[in-house]
């Protein structure tokens, strides 16, 4: 099951973080923050090939004993990070990739809202919040 979904701005500050259970919220914030180093390493290793790709699914960033952390980067360098419970062995790479695509599409809808200021935290979008909730339930 997905326990944390985060949207990180180009400048590496969180635009949106949602986690369950909430008593481990600080732990998930730390995991998301530490995964940004791995994301930067993968992006710099790709070099010029990064410019040619339409989407950048980074795959598994790093596993821990209880969780697996996956990453995705858009062309505008916005990063999506998903922390998944390691006990869920039924999740495949294709399913994680499609979840990131849904998250990216929903993020694009938020960006197209004329009342949203780019770079602000995503707080007032019920549609985005509902989509994240459905993704977290879907993975269970």
From Swiss-Prot:
InterPro entries: Longin-like_dom_sf (IPR011012), Sedlin (IPR006722), TRAPPC2L (IPR044760)
Superkingdom of source: Eukaryota
GO cellular component: cytoplasm; cytosol; endoplasmic reticulum; intracellular membrane-bounded organelle; nucleus; perinuclear region of cytoplasm; TRAPP complex; TRAPPII protein complex
Family as reported in the entry's similarity comment: Belongs to the TRAPP small subunits family. Sedlin subfamily.
Tissues where this protein is expressed: Expressed in testis, liver, bladder, lung, spleen and brain, several cell lines and primary chondrocytes cell line.
GO biological process, one term: endoplasmic reticulum to Golgi vesicle-mediated transport
Subcellular location: Cytoplasm, Perinuclear region; Endoplasmic reticulum; Golgi apparatus
Keyword Cell cycle set for record: no
Protein name, as recorded: Trafficking protein particle complex subunit 2-like protein
Pfam families according to UniProt: Sedlin_N (PF04628)
Connected disease: Encephalopathy, progressive, early-onset, with episodic rhabdomyolysis: An autosomal recessive disease characterized by progressive encephalopathy exacerbated by febrile illness and associated with severe neurodevelopmental delay, episodes of rhabdomyolysis, developmental regression, epilepsy and tetraplegia.
Subunit structure: Component of the multisubunit TRAPP (transport protein particle) complex, which includes at least TRAPPC2, TRAPPC2L, TRAPPC3, TRAPPC3L, TRAPPC4, TRAPPC5, TRAPPC8, TRAPPC9, TRAPPC10, TRAPPC11 and TRAPPC12. Interacts with the heterodimer TRAPPC3-TRAPPC6A. Interacts with TRAPPC6A.
């Amino acid at each position: 099951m997905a326990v944390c979904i985060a949207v990180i701005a180009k400048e590496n500050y969180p635009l949106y973080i949602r986690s369950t259970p909430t008593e481990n919220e600080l732990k998930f914030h730390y995991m998301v923050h530490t995964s940004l180093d791995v994301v930067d390493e993968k992006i710099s290793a790709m070099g010029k090939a990064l410019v040619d790709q339409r989407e950048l699914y980074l795959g598994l960033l790093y596993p821990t004993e209880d969780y697996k952390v996956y990453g995705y980067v858009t062309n505008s360098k916005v990063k999506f990070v998903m922390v998944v419970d390691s006990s869920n062995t039924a999740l495949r790479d294709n399913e994680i990739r499609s979840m990131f695509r849904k998250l990216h599409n929903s993020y694009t809808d938020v960006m197209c809202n004329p009342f949203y200021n780019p770079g602000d935290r995503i707080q007032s979008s019920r549609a985005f919040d509902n989509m994240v909730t459905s993704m977290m339930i879907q993975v269970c």
